[in-house]
Amino acid sequence: KSRLHKQCPPPRTKIELTLCLIPDSIMQEPPQIKNPSITLYPFHLRNDGDEGYDAVAKNAQSLWENLADNVGTQFNSNELKSLREKLICYKDKQYYPDSEKENLNNGKLLIPNSGETLDLQLITQPDLQKLDGSIYALRIHDTYTADLTFCYKNVTMKVADLNQLNPQGCLLPNAIKPSLGQTLLLYAAPAVYDTYPKLADECVKAFVHNQQQASPEFRAEGKLFGSPIFEYDSREDDAAKRCHILVWLQDNPQTLQSATLTFNYYLMNLLCSRAKIVFVYRKARKKYREAQQIVGELEEKLPEFGEVEKEQSQEVKLQKLKKLLAEVRTKMFACAQQVRYLQEDRNTIDINAENYAEALTRIKSLSIEGDNLDFLQRFLDLAEDKYQRQIEIDLKYLIASQDLFQQSISTLRGMVEIEQVELDREQVKLYKQKEDEEKIRDRQLENIIFFVGTAI
């Protein structure tokens, strides 16, 4: 026998094989990331143009109140809880926006001795991990915004634990309630993962953790400073509830070096312009629907013209015409207001599209070879092509309707004037007739008195 054959074990009487199917979920290690950070960029109107030039919005301070009271409490950050004391728009812990006129420096809202950025003391998480944090408060024209960042250093964690960066959903829009909307930027280095898109999906799902009524869905992807970036948006009509998230997964050592303060400034301006464009466009669509309703009500009044014409009584006809004229003029004024609002919205989108384009150009100038920022460019194209064009179409329709109803008002006025002249003429005729009758009666009375006197 061969040597190989001699080494073989003797045959067994019976061999039993048991196949165990191990599920992929057990074989595959759960996704993990390194050094994750979350940055909140909220955008909240400081001014209310409807209340007058440079008028402060009624709830302008609510952004700072929510960051201090809600987020500060959830993260147990004393610095964040005392945020009011660090802002120049507060005096004795009370909101005092007038102080911005004297103390505002390039839009920076933190008091000078706090520095440009307020560092938060290390926050101890339930698992005893340390969490760093900082906040940078800014006013961009008529809007309050901030860069509130929380991050882990030298930590590898399961993606499923990302909700630790969002306790009780305190960083989501339904908690922050920013009037113009917000963007959340989640940055991390992949550790254990399948694919980048799948990892990004899992990060969003874990971070939101069913705390958002309408979950943000994947919208686009690109590459920034050599690393893939994914965009998610819930696209709710209410800006204060709309959840916009960017997931940036480090795939290049140059990424962090390129994400400078200069880049962050341009990114904040770009996201602010984006939020304003989305907010104003949604508002413009609402105004247009209201204007359409007014136009519909005006169209329902047109058949009444013919009905009034059939009225036999001149006085009743005149009263009905005057009433109809008053109703049409009131609705025309309301329609004209909506047109003016739409024109203002169009101008606002124009201005912010220009600001967005400028910020995007600046970011592109900082980008590295291989970057792909088409998803940012597509939003600009959407604003310039769809949003602005839609408002132009709406305005043309409403202005054409305005012209039609203006002609109707002119016709009504003419009818009222004619009927008024006819009625006045008739009344003069009746007055003269009555006067003549009275003269005849007076003459007859004089004759009677004369004859009676003569007879006596």
Please identify what each model-predicted range represents.
Residues 5-7:
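Low-complexity, intrinsically disordered or signal/transmembrane-proximal segments
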Residues 19-184, 188-190:
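Long, solvent-exposed N-terminal ectodomains/accessory regions
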Residues 49-54, 155-161, 257-259, 282, ...:
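Generic local-structure boundary detector
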Residues 109-326:
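Extended alpha-helical interaction modules
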Residues 314, 320-456:
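Membrane-associated alpha-helical segments
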